[in-house]
């Protein structure tokens, strides 16, 4: 069994726990996820099964989008609803105030991750240090926010809803924290849902309950997306090479192409035969070099 599951992760469990539940439901050992989602967040969590784990890097460095709610008036240790209150503010920002501040959070930015995050500090996860009461001082890093839009502002309940489109590495909790500081009202994430990870969309995602039902009722892998699902932007070469050449590629051997091949300099590509995955290859100067070989 190999392929992708577009999982709709529920609130209350970690991404690692979601992976373990998928392992248990499908009775498979080789499972991974592309892009951690906080336990208190819900939404799209791409799950790689079997040989699809070899193409996980191509599912991580992609555009992501979120819907989230910021609660104003408080700053919390975790920058979400789970943390302890460390500061308060009586300021209630208006829609106009929020819209004026938003441009400062779009584009190439320097962002400091939350102290309660999976960022490594001297080989230890920051959240582990923070939980043990140790001082955590994280450095800022480059992130890219493509779009940040105010969807609604509820002054009566002092909260606001947003849509975010960004590249990898952006922490929504940091945006809520920094936006609250910018407005002088403080803030933290009250609700967070990821609605897109590259080609994976929320509207097509399935829950753990749906996965279990589909597996028990059919066992035909109807819930699995193909391995190449995350490689749609990569050049695909199907039934281009001979059986002998395919065998060499599967054995990790380089092969040289003659001038009859129009693909002799196409860079990174996905190779298959009969639409069965063979390998990710690099083809430069008429030489095919296997980069990732699929054992299917």
From Swiss-Prot:
EC number assigned by the record: 5.4.99.25
Entry keyword set: Isomerase, tRNA processing
Active site: 38
Annotated catalysed reactions: uridine(55) in tRNA = pseudouridine(55) in tRNA
Enzyme type, top EC level: isomerase
Family matches, as PANTHER family: PSEUDOURIDYLATE SYNTHASE TRUB1 (PTHR13767:SF2), TRNA-PSEUDOURIDINE SYNTHASE (PTHR13767)
Entry protein name: tRNA pseudouridine synthase B
Lineage: Bacteria, Pseudomonadati, Pseudomonadota, Alphaproteobacteria, Rickettsiales
Gene behind this protein: truB
């Amino acid at each position: 069994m190999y392929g992708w599951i577009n999982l709709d992760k529920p609130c209350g469990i970690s991404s690692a726990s979601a992976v373990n539940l998928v392992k248990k439901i499908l009775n498979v050992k080789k499972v991974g996820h592309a892009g951690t989602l906080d336990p208190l967040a819900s939404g799209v969590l791409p799950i790689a099964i079997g040989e699809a784990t070899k193409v996980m890097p191509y599912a991580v460095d992609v555009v992501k989008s979120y819907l989230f709610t910021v609660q104003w008036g408080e700053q919390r240790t975790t920058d979400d609803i789970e943390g302890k209150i460390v500061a308060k503010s009586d300021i209630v920002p208006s829609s106009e105030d929020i819209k004026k501040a938003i441009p400062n959070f779009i584009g190439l930015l320097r962002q400091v991750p939350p102290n309660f995050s999976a960022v490594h500090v001297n080989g230890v996860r920051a959240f582990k240090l923070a939980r043990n009461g140790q001082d955590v001082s994280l450095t800022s890093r480059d992130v890219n926010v493509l779009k940040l839009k105010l969807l609604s502002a509820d002054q009566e309940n002092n909260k606001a809803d947003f849509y975010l489109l960004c590249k990898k590495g952006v922490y929504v909790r940091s945006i809520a924290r920094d936006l609250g500081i910018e407005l002088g009202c403080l803030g933290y994430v009250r609700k967070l849902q990821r609605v897109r990870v590259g080609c994976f969309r929320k509207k097509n995602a399935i829950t753990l309950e749906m996965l279990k039902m589909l597996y028990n009722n059919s066992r035909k892998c109807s819930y699995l997306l193909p391995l190449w699902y995350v490689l749609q932007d990569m050049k695909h070469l199907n039934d281009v090479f001979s059986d002998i050449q395919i065998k060499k590629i599967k054995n990790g051997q380089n092969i040289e192409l003659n001038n009859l091949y129009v693909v002799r300099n196409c860079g990174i590509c996905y190779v298959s035969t009969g639409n069965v995955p063979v390998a990710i290859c690099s083809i430069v100067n008429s030489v095919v070099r296997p980069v990732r070989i699929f054992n299917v």
